[in-house]
């Protein structure tokens, strides 16, 4: 990605069919929304929680725009899941919790095709008014687990910048070692005691049957 004045140019020899103009239009639309919201904040001198949620959620939408175009040029059939429409939540704008059963109903009504690859921005859901809400710390991992639960997925894979779960914090303990397997109960205990690789509310989504299988 290269910025030239106010224009954004996207080039990659590995993706010659990539539609620069369409992608640029999507990115510009997202950034324009942020700019309008920021102008409102400057005028009012404050930032309500619902506005903060909309601004902080834009990063996921920008990532989805890139991913959608990169997968499209590879010839994949794609569809977008809008979390504000399908993930039913309760709580505030910045730390909402997903109602799994209510969300399952909406996913069932939408109907997912087996021949289609679905993309969904993480970290967000919808209020009872359809407004954007955030799922809090580790919200992207949480929304991945929520999505897996709502569609009865056989597996939920979370790719991150760390190798996995260690027996203790490798930043503090030099000889910390990677755990090859970990039960969901153990993962939940680690998260409650401060391990940042997993969040308690993500672990809570797994059933007791799944907990016996563990992570590995």
Per-range role (PLM):
Residues 1, 5-203:
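Nucleotide/pyrophosphate-binding catalytic subdomain
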Residues 3, 209-216:
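A short, hydrophobic C-terminal helix/tail in secreted or cell-surface proteins
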